[in-house]
């Protein structure tokens, strides 16, 4: 949905991802962090009515065409809104333990299996210095790639379609895991929703 952007519902209670992601982290992450991105994105766009009907993905793909005074705000807050909107959908109580369907086939063909993908995606997440995201993405030619982005940059800015995104900002895990990013990354595999990832893959 375009402007005014709204904070999406999670679709599950904050405590639903325990013990892997604690309820307090989920509440603060959703209400405070994601909520701030939505508020700031709307504030940036308020004085440009011609942009009010534009989806956030389109804004991010065409940052250079936006008024210069809002490019950074849209990049940071539009990226934060899109990234988290995807992230909440990709988490589920109990998780879908492994990829299915067409996505599973593509992973097997391009990475040599799910375990190899897990290792590659975890490496991308561990290797992201500071704040950012690790992604499984699909390119315009149908191939899968693993990459990481800084801050709140989204792969759509580089022409990719996100399939799975893992938040490695400290606010995603610090209350429970402190500086132990590796422990958080090990835990998050228990709650990733591969059914939704399959849905994203088919639509890409």
Curated annotation (Swiss-Prot):
It catalyses: 2 superoxide + 2 H(+) = H2O2 + O2. Its cofactor is Mn(2+). One of its GO terms (cellular component) is cytoplasm. One of its GO terms (molecular function) is superoxide dismutase activity. The keyword Oxidoreductase applies. Keywords: Manganese, Metal-binding, Oxidoreductase. Gene3D superfamilies: Fe,Mn superoxide dismutase (SOD) domain (1.10.287.990), Iron/manganese superoxide dismutase, C-terminal domain (3.55.40.20). Mn(2+) binds at residues 29, 84, 167, 171. Belongs to the iron/manganese superoxide dismutase family. Binds 1 Mn(2+) ion per subunit. Pfam families: Sod_Fe_C, Sod_Fe_N. Homotetramer. It comes from Thermus thermophilus (strain ATCC 27634 / DSM 579 / HB8). The keyword Magnesium does not apply. It comes from the Bacteria. This is Superoxide dismutase [Mn]. Destroys superoxide anion radicals which are normally produced within the cells and which are toxic to biological systems. Its EC number is 1.15.1.1. InterPro entries: Mn/Fe_SOD, Mn/Fe_SOD_BS, Mn/Fe_SOD_C, Mn/Fe_SOD_N, Mn/Fe_SOD_N_sf, SOD_C_sf.
């Amino acid at each position: 949905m375009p402007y005014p952007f709204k904070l999406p519902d999670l679709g599950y209670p904050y405590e639903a991802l325990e013990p892997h992601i604690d309820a307090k982290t989920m509440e603060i992450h959703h209400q405070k962090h994601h909520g701030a991105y939505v508020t700031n994105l709307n504030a940036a766009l308020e004085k440009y009515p011609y942009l009010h009907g534009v989806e956030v993905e389109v804004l991010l793909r065409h940052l250079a065409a936006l008024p210069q005074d809002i490019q950074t705000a849209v990049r940071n807050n539009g990226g934060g809104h899109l990234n988290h909107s995807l992230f909440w959908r990709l988490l589920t109580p109990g998780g879908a333990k492994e990829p299915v369907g067409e996505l599973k086939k593509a992973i097997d063909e391009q990475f040599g299996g799910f375990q190899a993908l897990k290792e590659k995606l975890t490496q991308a997440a561990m290797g992201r210095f500071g704040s950012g995201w690790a992604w499984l993405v699909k390119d315009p030619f149908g191939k899968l790639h693993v990459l990481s982005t800084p801050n709140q940059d989204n792969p759509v800015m580089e022409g990719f379609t996100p399939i799975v995104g893992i938040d490695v900002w400290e606010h995603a895990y610090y209350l429970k895991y402190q500086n132990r990013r590796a422990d958080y990354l090990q835990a998050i595999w228990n709650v990733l929703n591969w059914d939704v990832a399959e849905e994203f893959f088919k639509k890409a």
